[in-house]
UniProtKB/Swiss-Prot annotation:
Name of the featured protein: Ropporin-1
Family: Belongs to the ropporin family.
Subcellular location: Cell projection, Cilium, Flagellum
Gene Ontology annotations of biological process type: cilium organization; flagellated sperm motility; protein localization to cilium; regulation of protein phosphorylation; sperm capacitation
Note: 'Ropporin' comes from the Japanese word 'oppo' which means 'tail'.
PTM statement from Swiss-Prot or TrEMBL: Sumoylated, sumoylation decreases upon spermatozoa capacitation conditions.
Amino acid sequence: PQTDKQVCIPPELPELLKTQPPDLIQWAAEYFGAMSRGEIPPVRLIIHADELAQMWKTLKIVCEVLSCDHDGGPPRIPFSTFQFLYTYIAEVDGEISSSHVSRMLNYIEQEVIGPDGLIKVNDFTQNPR
């Protein structure tokens, strides 16, 4: 039914719509939990192409430096090393929730790393998921 009452659209709605969480229940708990504590609710971080390219370049350099392979091929590091670095960087960053870190590391462990337990840059850049 149509009414004369004006609907107020919150100014943060466009940012909220960008979030598109993979786990709606987890996201809703985090979102409404943050609102109840007077904190800024989670929104999807927008990374521009040049910034993303720099991140991939940095990841490649880290993998090359830490690689246990020195005979050509793509640089690879043990998953345990990647897990330690990712967890440490996420903690230092302070904007990545521990639940996100756990989900991401679990996904990589189950779906990305090979039977040798090594992870490489191509696993991120060429993985269709």
